From Swiss-Prot:
Organism the protein comes from: Mycobacterium sp. (strain KMS)
Domain of life: Bacteria
Protein name: Recombination protein RecR
Residues of the Toprim domain: 79-179
CDD domains, alphabetized: TOPRIM_recR (cd01025)
Zinc finger (C4-type): 56-71
Any coiled-coil regions, as ranges: none
One GO molecular-function entry: DNA binding
Ranges annotated as spanning the membrane: none
Described purpose of this protein according to its UniProt entry: May play a role in DNA repair. It seems to be involved in an RecBC-independent recombinational process of DNA repair. It may act with RecF and RecO.
GO biological process, one term: DNA repair
Family: Belongs to the RecR family.
Source lineage: Bacteria, Bacillati, Actinomycetota, Actinomycetes, Mycobacteriales
UniProt KW keywords: DNA damage, DNA recombination, DNA repair, Metal-binding, Zinc, Zinc-finger
Length: 203
C-alpha cells in the first residue's frame, strides 16, 4: 500500500474495466512522471466528459447534444434501426460502412445473475420509438446486433418475442460468422459487414 493520494489514484484506476492492480499502479506512476500541463489536459478532458457528454434522447448513443450526429443526419434511413448493446458497438458497426440506418443502444444485455432484467435496459424506449414514428418515419426493420454470447442471444430472443407481432415490422438478426462468446467491438470490419449483409429474418 502506498500513502495518501497515490494509493487513492491506484484504487480509482483499478475500478476501470480491464485495469488490474498492476496496471493501475503502472498508470499511476506514469501520471506522476509526466509534466503538469499533461495532467492539466487530462483533467480538462475528464471534466468535459463529466459536464458535457450526455446520451442521445432518441437512440441512447453518447453525444454532446440532445441528439447524436447519426440521429440528426437526414441522410440516414430512419426506417432501419440496428439494436446494439453499448455505444462502442455503434462505432464497430459504423466502421463497416455497410449500414446507413440508425441505431438503438440498449445499455447492456439481459443477465439475470447480475440483476440485469428488461427494466434495466432501454427496451421500452425501443418499443415507444417504433410506435411513435420518430421524425415521421415508420420503422420497417429492426436489426438485432447484440453480442454473440449467452447474454446477447438471450437479449435477442427476448426482443424477437416483444417485436414479432408489430404489424409491418421485419425483425432480423445479424448472420453467423462472428465467434460465439465474442464482443461486437472486436470483430473486424469485413466479418461484421458480411454479418450485417447476411442478416436473417427472425419474425
Amino acid at each position: 500500500m502506498f500513502e495518501g493520494p497515490v494509493q487513492d489514484l491506484i484504487d480509482e484506476l483499478g475500478k476501470l474495466p480491464g485495469i488490474g492492480p498492476k496496471s493501475a499502479q503502472r498508470i499511476a506512476f506514469h501520471l506522476l512522471s509526466v509534466e503538469p500541463p499533461d495532467i492539466d489536459r487530462l483533467t480538462a478532458v475528464l471534466n468535459r466528459i463529466r459536464d458535457g457528454v450526455k446520451f442521445c434522447e432518441v437512440c441512447g448513443n453518447v453525444s454532446d447534444a440532445d441528439r447524436c450526429r447519426i440521429c440528426s443526419d437526414p441522410r440516414r434511413d430512419a426506417s432501419l434501426v440496428c439494436v446494439v448493446e453499448e455505444p462502442k458497438d455503434v462505432q464497430a458497426v459504423e466502421r463497416t460502412r455497410e449500414f446507413r440506418g440508425r441505431y438503438h443502444v440498449l445499455g447492456g444485455a439481459l443477465d439475470p445473475l447480475s440483476g440485469v432484467g428488461p427494466d434495466q435496459l432501454r427496451i421500452r424506449e425501443l418499443l415507444n420509438r417504433i410506435g411513435e414514428r420518430v421524425d415521421g418515419v415508420d420503422v420497417a426493420e429492426v436489426i438485432i446486433a447484440t453480442d454473440p454470447n449467452t447474454e446477447g442471444e438471450a437479449t435477442a430472443t427476448y426482443l424477437v418475442r416483444m417485436l414479432r407481432d408489430i404489424p409491418g415490422l421485419t425483425v432480423t438478426r445479424i448472420a453467423s460468422g462472428l465467434p460465439m462468446g465474442g464482443d461486437l467491438e472486436f470483430a473486424d470490419e469485413l466479418t461484421l459487414g458480411r454479418a450485417l449483409a447476411g442478416r436473417r429474418a427472425m419474425a
